[in-house]
Amino acid sequence: MARYSESVCRLCRRENLKMYLKGDRCYTDKCAIERRPYPPGQHGQGRTKFSEYGVQLREKQKVKRMYGLLEAGFRHAYQNAAAAKGKTGENLLQTLELRLDNVVFRLGFADTRNEARQLVRHGHFKVNGRKVNIPSYLCRPGDKVELKDRSKKVVRITEALEAVDRRGVPAWLDLDKGGFKGTVKTSPAREDITMPIQEQLIVELYSK
C-alpha cells in the first residue's frame, strides 16, 4: 500500500502545527517546527492567502496527515460518518479515533500512529482475545486491546510504554500498563479530541 515516504517533519511545517508524527523528537527542541516555524520550500517564509476552497482543502490534508491516511481511506471514513446519525464532522473524528491503529497509539504502545499501524499489521495485538491485524478495524466501547504474549518483550513497545506518562492516555481509554492491555471505556466525545481541528470545513469540502 502506498504511503508518504518523505520527511514527516515537513508535513508539520506545511500545516504550521505540531502533529507529533516523529515520536519523542516532537517533545524536544530538535522538533523541526520549533526550529523553522514556516512551510518548507524556497518560498516557505512568504505569506500565502488561501481561497475558501483552499482553506477547506488544507484542513482535510491536515487531518489526513495527522491520522496517516491516504485519500481513499479518509473518504471511506467520511462516507461512514455521513451515513451515521448525528453531526457528520464529529462522527468523522470519532471514527478516526476508534481505528485500532489510533487506539494502540493512544494507549501508548507506540510513539506514533505510523508505528502503531505497523505493529497492528505485524499481528502484535488481540482484540477481545482474537488476533486483529487490520489497522482500520473500528473498536467499540467495551473492547479490550491487548499485546500478544510473544510481543511483550519487543523493545520499541516497552520503550513507548515507559514514556506513556508524558503523553497521557485519553479519558475514554483505560490502560493497564503492567498487563500490556487497555480497554475502550466509551466512544470519544468531541471535547476529548484536543488537536485544533475544524471538522466543519471538511464537511463543507466533501459537500460540494
From Swiss-Prot:
The keyword Lyase does not apply. It comes from the Bacteria. It holds the Pfam family S4. One of the primary rRNA binding proteins, it binds directly to 16S rRNA where it nucleates assembly of the body of the 30S subunit. With S5 and S12 plays an important role in translational accuracy. GO terms for cellular component: small ribosomal subunit. The keyword RNA-binding applies. GO terms for molecular function: rRNA binding; structural constituent of ribosome. It comes from Anaeromyxobacter dehalogenans (strain 2CP-C). PANTHER family: 30S 40S RIBOSOMAL PROTEIN, SMALL RIBOSOMAL SUBUNIT PROTEIN US4M. Part of the 30S ribosomal subunit. Contacts protein S5. The interaction surface between S4 and S5 is involved in control of translational fidelity. The lineage of its organism: Bacteria, Pseudomonadati, Myxococcota, Myxococcia, Myxococcales. This is Small ribosomal subunit protein uS4. One of its GO terms (biological process) is ribosomal small subunit biogenesis. Residues 98-159 form the S4 RNA-binding domain. The gene is rpsD. Keywords: Ribonucleoprotein, Ribosomal protein, RNA-binding, rRNA-binding. Belongs to the universal ribosomal protein uS4 family. NCBIfam families: PRK05327.1, rpsD_bact.
